Amino acid sequence: MRFYKFICVLFTGVGITGFYGQSKINCDLVGISNIAFEKNPTIQRSAYTIKSAEADFQIQRSVFDVNLFSEVAVKTNRYTLFGEDPRNQFIDKILKTNTLDFSAGVRKKLRTGQITDISLKYGFNNNNFPYDGFNQYVGAFWGNHVSSVNLSLTQPLLRGRGRDVTTISERISQLYIENSKSSNEFTNSNTILQIGQAYWNYYLAYKRVEIYKQNEGRVRNVLDVTKELIKADKKPAGDLAQVNADLANQEKLTALAEQSLFEARVNLGRAIGLSNEESLQLGIPVNDFPTIPESEYRIDLDRTAFIKIAKEKRGDLQAVGKISDALEMQYRLAENNTKPQLDLTGFVFYGSAIAGNGIDKTFSSFTNNEGRNLGAGAKLTFTFPVNNNLAKGNYAKDLVSLNDQKISNENLQRNIELNISNAINKLDNSVIVLERAKEALDSYKEAFNSEQVKLQAGLTTILNVILFQERLTSSELEYLQAYQQFANAIISLRHETGTLISQGDRGFTLNQDVFYTIPNIANY
């Protein structure tokens, strides 16, 4: 029975281990970046701003939609005649009237500014008075049919005149679509920058655990050597307490490093857009720190060339350029709206009438020669608010917005230039720090190995060995941090120059090179 339970527990454990092993998320830079494009909330929300801008464009296009309109009105009326009314001899004091009015038409505003209107109207009425309008006896409720077709064209002469003014709101909306796309690109780049920094922090935390564990191993080595030396009466027994204390301290540092590793993993998942459960499934970091030769770094980088690349590639700079164009158009529209409304309308109409009952009379009312009415005309409409405060206020606000945006654009360009200078300087310094950290690490390794040999020969103290071991560990950590600073400097320069991600037919893409190499000026 116990054997059976053991087998069940064993296979259950293997199954669970296999399940979690299969669900691990491969933690390489390109892979997690692609996951972020799909799952990161900031990226998703940024994409919705594009859809919102496209919806605004659709709203502006609605101004030029074809509008169909129709109306049907049915009315019955009972009018009590005056006593002196001669119609009382033919009807019993009450004049009963029935009326039907129907109209339908099409109205459209053209992109050249004109408004066209085509409408059809039909009217029918009858009453219980037995004589018609020509004093002929026709009997009660004899129908009268009237129909007409009207065509009008309205041309604005001042406000709203011309294609440039009429379509300006539509073109402004198109600029805001382009603005939202460029802003989305910069948002994606900034998110990938944060992911890159979080990844290098995760990789650093992972390597720190390795270093502390290696350090533990070195201390245990020293402990074993110390025990042997004590047995050989080459060292006092009191030295063992020092080594044990150092070992306990190193185990504490390893535990703290593992805690930092856990936090770094969760923070990387946060930057990607993963849930808590998904973040805990992130595997060990796959990509190592970039090397200096691999990065294509060179001394005396051309700041001017990188600034030029940034002005061509940065999404936020392109976005504010579109906003400036849109505000310029909005300003022109506000200026036009300060003008009076003066519209010239030309119209033609055709109508006819017929009397009688029956459905055939309804259609004959459009073609009957008798009662035909054909004409044309024009009208001039003038509208202008006396103070015109609304138009003047909007004009003043748009002028302020335009000038404010110019200052904002200049400030952004100024900050981009400063940021690129800082990024290049940071890269230069990180290379120097990395090279010096490597030299220091090699020296400390050599010194520690020498102290170990001396210890085995009984030529140095345990305290000296512990001191050199701590310096070696500190040097290894500083070397890792120097690498992290170098890696972050590369992606920061990429982000500042707008070369961290690229827009493809299927969305944003990137490759591993953007995390390992600085921008190549010749490619831009």
Where do the protein language model's features map onto the residues?
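A glycine-/polar-enriched beta->alpha junction
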Residues: 34-44, 51-66, 103-130, 137-143, ...
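Periplasmic alpha-helical coiled-coil/stalk elements that build and connect Gram-negative outer-membrane
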Residues: 182-306, 426, 433, 471-472, ...
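Amphipathic alpha-helical coiled-coil segments
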Residues: 45-60, 187-212, 246, 264-269, ...
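Bacterial Sec-dependent N-terminal signal peptides
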Residues: 1-25
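Extended, hydrophobic alpha-helical segments in both membrane/secreted and soluble proteins
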Residues: 226, 243, 327, 342-346, ...
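Acidic, low-complexity, intrinsically disordered peripheral segments
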Residues: 20, 78, 266-284, 289-297, ...
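Bacterial Sec-pathway N-terminal export signals of envelope proteins
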Residues: 21-99, 153-168, 172, 234, ...
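Small/polar, glycine/serine/threonine/aspartate-rich low-complexity segments that form flexible
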Residues: 23, 72-151, 288-298, 332-336, ...
